[in-house]
């Protein structure tokens, strides 16, 4: 990280699984997402003094309309890209066939089979959510 980095972003994302499917979303206002369009795992910045676990649970409620009592940390990622990012990657399970209602800044929420995910070019940040899901697959599901 460059010594002159003045922007720091703490972010949580949540891979919501329902059976063999994962939820991806597209946002209405992409300014908070580095102007990126395309599919994302539901995510948001951490609020002041918010624990990452609480952020992941909030994201499930605010963006997918589901309260999830149990989220599990998959891994943490850190990178600089003009701003330093620390990303907490969480996962949670919903019952098979769960219906989601896009809310807040979510324009579209769609379940994708794990064997039929979108092409990287259709996923924000050059397919980053696909890389996160691949890293999660290396662990227990």
Residue ranges and their predicted role:
Residues 1-24, 76:
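Conserved N-terminal beta-strand and adjoining loop/helix that marks the start
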Residues 7, 34, 81-85:
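Short coil/turn motifs at beta-sheet boundaries
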Residues 31-37:
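A conserved beta-turn-beta hairpin within the catalytic core of GNAT-like acetyltransferases
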Residues 40:
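Conserved glycine-rich beta-strand-loop-beta hairpin in the small C-terminal domain of fold type I
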Residues 44-69, 77-128:
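Unchanged
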Residues 127-141:
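Charged phosphate-binding loop/patch that engages nucleotide di/tri-phosphates or the phosphate backbone
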């Amino acid at each position: 990280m460059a010594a002159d980095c003045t922007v720091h972003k703490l972010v949580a994302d949540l891979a919501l699984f329902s059976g063999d499917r994962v939820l991806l979303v597209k946002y209405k206002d992409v300014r908070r997402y580095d102007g990126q369009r395309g599919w994302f795992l539901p995510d948001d910045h951490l609020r002041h003094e918010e624990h990452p676990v609480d952020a992941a649970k909030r994201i499930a409620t605010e963006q997918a309309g589901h309260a999830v009592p149990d989220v599990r940390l998959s891994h943490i990622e850190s990178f600089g890209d003009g701003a330093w990012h620390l990303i907490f990657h969480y996962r949670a399970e919903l019952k098979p066939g769960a219906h989601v209602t896009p809310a807040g800044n979510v324009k579209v929420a769609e379940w994708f089979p794990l064997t039929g995910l979108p092409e990287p070019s259709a996923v924000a940040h050059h397919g980053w959510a696909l890389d996160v899901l691949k890293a999660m697959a290396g662990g227990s599901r």
